[in-house]
Amino acid sequence: MNPGLYADLTKPTADFIKKDFAETFKLDTTFKGKYGSIVAVTDIKDSGVVASIQPKADFTKYLGKVSNGNFTVDTNGVKKGEFTIENIIPGLKAVANGDSKQNFSTEFQYKKDKIAFTLFGHNNKSFNTSLAFLINPTFSVGVQAEGNAKNTLKNVNATITIRPRPDVFVSIVDRFMDKQILLSTLYTATSKLSFAGDVTVDLKASEKAPSFNVGTQYKIDSASLLKAKVNNNRKVNISYIYNTSNNTKFVLGWNVNTKNFKQGNTFGATVNLTL
């Protein structure tokens, strides 16, 4: 798991490649109220139906600091909760998590000016920590490390992001322990048309072809857009997104395995409602 602030370094391209591609039939509804909200999700997959409900409560007026808590239960029997409090001191945020599998963690995020630091501790005595630094508007760097109770490093990553122009974003991630290098880029060609891609090279298996994703997005108008992507396994995802308002969003997806076109076609749809 990458701590949130470290993962934010590569978020522009990651979101472009991963978000708004519907491969299942999903209804995500948020009911807002005076003291918080309730999020209900129903996801219909080939393996069955998974439903979850998540009440969220706002404790800001009781604690005097921006804070909230939520509890999630799903039909697979998973129960988990989270409590967040911000600005314990200026720039410091704390997040506590727990679930029915007896996994507990506490995360501290500190973000101020050009520096972001995260420390993530688990009840199994493992840890995850990261440091990100904005050198200037063009360059950012970050390092992330994961270890266990025996003071053994399990993972070390480093990231460099480059924004040479407002319309170009590039990130380079070196996964030292896994011996992998990930290169990603996002290019905004016009106000309507954008392109993105990522490629992962496995240095442990130089004979293996790199894995990749290539995607594009076209804004039809202020409310709708088209997205498409293809990966190294020749899987194609095409998506139509329509925002009827700030409270309603529809995503229609067509997913094709070009290696087996007759049997590799699936469709999906996602509906996001805020009431």
UniProtKB/Swiss-Prot annotation:
One of its GO terms (cellular component) is pore complex. The modification Blocked amino end (Met) is found at M1. Disulfide bonds: none annotated. Transmembrane segments: none annotated. One of its GO terms (biological process) is regulation of monoatomic ion transmembrane transport. InterPro entries: Porin_dom_sf, Porin_Euk, Porin_Euk/Tom40. It is found in: Mitochondrion outer membrane. Its main location: mitochondrion. Pfam families: Porin_3. Keywords: Ion transport, Membrane, Mitochondrion, Mitochondrion outer membrane, Porin, Transmembrane, Transmembrane beta strand, Transport. One of its GO terms (molecular function) is voltage-gated monoatomic anion channel activity. Belongs to the eukaryotic mitochondrial porin family. Highly divergent. Consists mainly of membrane-spanning sided beta-sheets. Forms a channel of about 1,7 nM through the cell membrane that allows diffusion of small hydrophilic molecules. The channel adopts an open conformation at low or zero membrane potential and a closed conformation at potentials above 20 mv. The open state has a weak anion selectivity whereas the closed state is cation-selective. This is Mitochondrial outer membrane protein porin. It comes from Dictyostelium discoideum. The gene is porA.
